[in-house]
UniProtKB/Swiss-Prot annotation:
One of its GO terms (cellular component) is virion component. It is found in: Virion; Host nucleus; Host cytoplasm. Plays a role in nucleocapsid assembly and is essential for viral replication. Distributed over the cylindrical capsid sheath of nucleocapsid. Disulfide bonds: none annotated. The keyword Cell membrane does not apply. It comes from the Viruses. It comes from Autographa californica nuclear polyhedrosis virus (AcMNPV). Pfam families: DUF705. Its main location: virion. This is Uncharacterized 38.0 kDa protein in P143-LEF5 intergenic region.
């Protein structure tokens, strides 16, 4: 839950950035010196907390490489920070949040967000699984897309049309289930959902006996040659787990963004979570809460329309 306390932020936009859309997050303006010669041109945006020093504004205004915007936003809300950067500079797309490896800032909004060390920006590849700048939609599986029955069924046949339309719109579709790899694989096969998702994430599970059809690689992925699927095991360390009073770990955008980056999706417009559990939502741009479905129910068109409307409203906002 975001704090109601507002902090002032200075966001700078570099006029002649070599690499566009990435955001460098600093503890203070003076930290720019740690980038070294000409490295500042790799970051179009720079953001840091405003310390109410009027002299600082004058110094920045005299640096003609940058234009400056000041805005207020909660210090623990990445969603608000991203929105304000986009709003201030009228850009619908951002790249990675980057930090100095030798002097990382300690802002709360950086929790549960994938942070790219500043020196890795130049090594990012341009080839991607998608053209243009996509919206990312993350779906839960159990009681969201499928039922809770022992023999699972699709929640609503309209789910297929919904996923197909989102795919045709250029969205990157991610499935993230806290179920075991076997459960996810077999459930998707049983309801014919295998071909719709660009990334499939499941909670890590221990294989009880050695199986010749499973091969695990160095990227925490298991390739199941019987099912012809590649599953990513969630082995990330969560930043906020120790700060929560319950045992529900949210579906951190950190993990999604990391695997998007692995597929060279380094820029996106918005990220949406579609899930029946509100506790899974943390720092997503949009959250679509669905009702549980122990058995099939024909209600998916309502949720589909909400997803689409959010995307359309987002696009319209930046056309104004």
């Amino acid at each position: 839950m975001a704090s109601s306390l507002q902090s002032k932020w200075i966001c700078l936009r570099l006029n002649d950035a070599i690499i566009k859309r990435h955001v460098l997050v600093l503890s203070e303006y003076a930290d720019l010196k740690y980038l070294g010669f000409e490295k500042y041109k790799f970051f179009e945006y720079v953001i840091f907390q405003f310390c109410n020093d009027p002299q600082l504004c004058k110094i920045i205004e005299n640096n003609y490489n940058y234009c400056m915007q000041i805005f207020k936003a909660p210090a623990d809300d990445m969603r608000d920070i991203r929105h304000n950067i986009k709003r201030a500079f009228k850009t619908p797309v951002l790249g990675h949040m980057c930090v100095l490896s030798n002097k990382p800032p300690m802002y709360s909004f950086l929790k549960e967000w994938f942070l790219l060390p500043h020196y890795k920006v130049v090594s990012l590849k341009s080839e991607s699984l998608t053209w243009g700048f996509p919206h990312v939609v993350v779906f839960d599986l159990d009681s969201t897309l499928i039922t809770e029955e022992e023999q699972v069924e699709i929640r609503d046949p309209f789910v297929y049309d919904s996923l197909q339309e989102l795919h045709e719109m250029g969205c990157v579709l991610v499935l993230w289930s806290y179920g075991s790899r076997d459960h996810v694989a077999h459930s998707m096969r049983d309801v014919d959902l295998e071909g719709y998702f660009d990334i499939i994430i499941s909670e890590g599970s221990t294989v009880q006996e050695e199986r010749s059809d499973l091969v695990q690689n160095s990227h925490n992925a298991i390739v199941d040659y019987n099912l012809k699927k590649r599953f990513i095991e969630n082995k990330f360390v969560f930043d906020i787990h120790n700060h929560r009073s319950d045992n529900n770990i949210p579906k951190s955008p950190k993990i999604v963004i990391k695997y998007l980056s692995d597929k060279n999706v380094n820029f996106f417009k918005s990220i949406t979570l579609v899930d029946d559990l509100p506790t899974n939502n943390y720092a997503y741009d949009f959250y679509v809460k669905v009702k549980r479905c122990p058995t099939p129910v024909q209600d998916w068109e309502h949720y589909h329309n909400e997803i689409i409307q959010n995307i359309m409203d987002y696009e319209q906002y930046f056309i104004k």
